Amino acid sequence: MISTASLALLAALASGADPVAAASPAIAPRPDPIAELQAALAKLAASTPATARFSVRYENSTGEGKDQVKVAGEVSGEVSESAGGLAVRWGRAVLAQAHDEERRHAADPEVPTPTRDGLAQVQAIELANRLDAAGTLRDELAKATLVEVREEPFDGAPARLLVLKLAPALQARERRYVKELDAVGKIWLGADGIPLAAEARILGKGRIFLVIGFETEIRQAWRFARVGDRLVALRHEDERRWSGAGDRGERKSATVLELLPVTPPGP
């Protein structure tokens, strides 16, 4: 009796197909790591309420030598997100300090205003992104290209590292001036496929009006934690340096979140 495999082989020979390929079992394609991560992040819908105490520390500097100007400070507040939207709350002491700095600065423009400037540094959309880091990551992954996947421990625990080529969004004017752009991202995944941490580095060089060269570098780092159906960025560091047209500057910031118990709504 002729077996099923033999019949398949004879059919392949008759059709001119590769008999080896016809006799070999089908091999399932390897899953795309980016698609796998996108699917895992899609399950983190950030639908449950969340409340966190946050602090933002910043340091900005522009110029060099005697013309260098530095400002630095730190502010703390509370952020919460629920079905009703996002709410940012500042303590009375923080607001009182900012008002006091404004009054003293009005009398003497040389008086620093670290608290007032710190309040201006904090953006509601950035806090929302910290409470829903999965959504932000999905947007970036949609434009990223996989470079490498390897096993690499993170904080002493087994983890898988994805190395990505990023595609930062540039406006038409920026695309005209930027001649070189290198953007690399790294994401460490835990055993459950959920991100533990991430890093990004963007280096751009260009020229304006053929004679004015410029260079900018952006470095960012995140630490994540899964809380219910949320991926929360418990820590985010951002460093930016730029130079051009005889000037240079640097901006550093670090945002830290401490999750708080969510108070259920009253009857």
Q: Would you name each region that the model predicts?
A:
Residues 8-11, 88-90, 227-232:
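Extended interaction regions within the primary functional domain
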Residues 76-78, 184-188, 221-223:
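Short, surface-exposed charged micro-motifs
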Residues 23-182, 202-214, 250-267:
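Structured extracytoplasmic
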Residues 201-255:
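Short aromatic loop motif centered on NTY/YTY
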Residues 1-18:
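Sec-dependent N-terminal signal peptides
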Residues 181-203, 231-237:
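Extended soluble regions of mature proteins
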